[in-house]
Amino acid sequence: MDVLHAHDLYGEQLIDRVGDAVNEDAGDDLDTLVEGQQQQRLGVYRQMDILLDAPQEPPLGVFPAQGGPNGPPRLRKKRSFYTMTKPTPPCQSQEPEMCVLMASVTRAMRHVREDQRGEYFANYLVENMTSQNYPNGVGLPQHWGQL
């Protein structure tokens, strides 16, 4: 009679882990790699799971606009573009501040055809921006961007 010994039954199987015996694994670590990847994915998504499980911030009962310990709900003021704008004084709504030379060239350009205005503008400045027309620089731009 053959007597079965425990070590004879499992002598042929090398068990790395419990999963190897259940899955009849050949002893390679393929399932270990797959499980490691699953653990890594769980670690990546752990923070997202924590955020999704978190309660709404702030809790609706504590927020004063919804009522609660601070008193009755307060109505929020609705803002509109028309209510936020302030009327400008009449002097600001007209033409912006400009030097005398720019004002005169603007007036002169109104009488020139649209396709010739660029050339006319340059010629007008060359002819009229002289020390004879503006003695001691009075009326000329005092800083960049004033033209």
Swiss-Prot record:
The keyword Glycoprotein applies. Residues 57-76 are annotated as: Disordered. InterPro entries: Soti. It comes from the Eukaryota. GO terms for biological process: sperm individualization. Glycans are attached at N128. The keyword Glycoprotein applies. It holds the Pfam family SOTI. Keywords: Developmental protein, Differentiation, Glycoprotein, Spermatogenesis. Post-meiotically transcribed gene that has a role in late spermiogenesis; required for actin cone progression during spermatid individualization. Belongs to the male-specific scotti family. This is Male-specific protein scotti.
